[in-house]
Design a protein with these regions (language model features):
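Short "lid" loop at the C-terminus of a central beta-strand within the Rossmann-like core
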Residues: 122
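N-terminal catalytic or cofactor-binding beta/alpha core of small enzyme domains
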Residues: 1-112, 116-119, 128-139, 144-163
Length: 163
């Protein structure tokens, strides 16, 4: 069985900046996904490179500048993640997700499948809870992650062409 690592990125003391952590917790609380590890990645650290290297599949939730309305959710998969990270619009953290992916790539331990689920923030600043707009996005963000996990785990012969 493949193992999936779900990272929630962000600072929960800065309102919507903690959206990734809140989305990860929502997924863990509302979905039964065996062989899935949930990790509050905070504002990221190079120490997470080992966790990423040991994952077959990786999903990262984060507040991201996706040029959309507050609370909108966008899913980037595999090469789309790489393109988005190269755009420089995404991370407000000291160590970026792009840095961690580069480490995994250089060491030859890039997960087989990976996705970034970005949530457009509304309020960045002090606050121990996300804005109402971003809070309402949690079910949609978690549902997207659960769907990806199920899709990635299906045997190849069960996946219809074009999915």
């Amino acid at each position: 069985m493949t193992n999936t690592l779900v990272l929630g990125v962000g600072n929960v003391l800065l309102a919507d900046e903690g959206a990734g952590v809140h989305a990860m917790r929502y997924l863990a609380d509302h979905y039964d996904l065996p062989d899935t590890t949930y990790l509050d990645a905070g504002t990221l650290s190079f120490t997470l490179a080992a966790d990423i290297a040991n994952a077959d599949h990786l999903i990262v939730f984060d507040a991201a500048q996706i040029d959309s309305e507050p609370g909108d959710v966008k899913v980037f998969q595999d090469g789309e993640v790489d393109d988005f990270l190269k755009s420089g619009r995404c991370s407000v953290h000291e160590v970026g997700f792009a840095d961690l992916m580069d480490i995994a790539r250089l060491e030859g331990y890039l997960p087989e499948r990976y996705a970034l689920i970005g949530i457009q923030p509304e309020k960045l600043g002090w606050g121990d809870a996300p804005s109402e707009t971003v809070r309402r996005a949690m079910p949609r963000a978690a549902g997207n992650a659960a769907a990806l996990i199920h899709k990635w785990r299906r045997p190849v012969h069960d996946v219809a062409v074009g999915q």
